[in-house]
Amino acid sequence: RIESIIDRFDMSFFKNQKISDLSTGQTQRVGIARCLVHDPKYYILDEPTSGLDIISSQVILDFIKEEKKNGKCVLYSTHYMEEAENICDRVVLIHKGEVIEIGTPKEIEKKTKTTNLRDAFFALIGGSKNEME
């Protein structure tokens, strides 16, 4: 099982290194891989793609999608609205520590008359995305 997980996350080239010698992305992958060894029923992932390169991020996102298809529950926090839109069945939008909306991405977009979660978020807080950039 461990070898298949190492292969899944493309970690064979650093499997014998100390964790302190790994990059942020490599450390993230090791953390998620450690969870997989135990075959949990659910995952709680706090910004698992933060600080990762695009390839490592995609490996993590593909893993999450696959685990969801296998019936696993994933609680996923992120600041990346596009990720939430692509992998989450339901989202909770939070602003300044307060819940401002809960629903599927499509429900929230319909309610705010927008076409994506990022625009929906700004519509809900009464600001424009240009003001925040």
Identify the function of each model-found stretch.
Residues 18-22:
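Conserved ABC ATPase signature
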Residues 32:
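Hydrophobic anchor residue at the start of the ABC signature
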Residues 39:
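Conserved catalytic motifs of ABC-family nucleotide-binding domains
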